[in-house]
Amino acid sequence: MNRRMTALAAGLCAALAVPAQAAPEMSLARFECGTPQAPTPVNQRFSDTYAYGDLKLQFVYSCYLVKHGDDYLLWDTGHAMTAPNVAPKVSLVDLLAKINLKPDQIKYVGISHFHADHTGQAASFPKSTLLIGQGDWDVLTSAKPPGNANPAPFASWIKGDGKVEPVPQDKDVFGDGSVIMLYTPGHTPGHHSLLVKLPQMGPVFISGDLMHFHENYDTNGVPSFNTDRAQTLASLDRAKKIVAANKATVVIQHDARDVDKLPAFPAAAK
């Protein structure tokens, strides 16, 4: 018995002596993925209760790069380079080149939803695994997608040339809880937001288009063009609880007032 206990104790000591695996290096960078236009009225289009009066806001078009160890997630791909008036001044491929990254180094392209200002440059990353909400993927691959869902940027994945993972609910992207795609439907059927837990800055909640500006978020405003009002309100409620529970910084992708919450590219939050 004593020999057995001694052997067990020795094994336990050996196990405890194995150093814990170091947490992967993480960072979050913002790209400008479209050309902002003059401030525009938001009352009717962005509130189905006409809540915003004469409010005018300038919209920005944000994409994000998450570094997780040696892996990268690109969150949204902005406007196409051919988009009239709002096309980016610099392509995502050229922006990535500034930090010595090539398209085939991007492991995942995560899409918040299927609208053109979030999907325009997806085709530049055909070797990346596409992460997109199941509901949105179903729309894109349907016989007659609606006009606001353009399948063209996803042609390689639709044909089966690239790997796609339709996401029906939440997805722990890297398997360690540090980057989570959050199911927040309502704006589109499969809409997702993103929670990134940075070691220094702390958790960051990236909205997608769950809300377009802080007045949307603060008042539970529902745009008139959302696909489901009840889902939108439920998603806003869930998002606020996630933000509170994680003490997360809220970054609204289209709100120009949130651009400075992250360092200016090529710097990144850590």
Language-model segments: residues:
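Active-site metal-binding motif and surrounding structural segment of the metallo-beta-lactamase
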Residues: 85-132
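Short, electropositive alpha-helical surface patch
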Residues: 82-83, 91-92, 131, 186, ...
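Bacterial N-terminal signal peptides
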Residues: 9-17
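Bacterial N-terminal signal peptides that target proteins for export
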Residues: 1-9
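Short acidic/His/Gly/Ser-rich catalytic and metal-binding motifs that mark active-site loops
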Residues: 39-41, 82-84, 139-141, 214-217
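Metallo-beta-lactamase
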Residues: 16-105, 134-183, 201-208, 244, ...
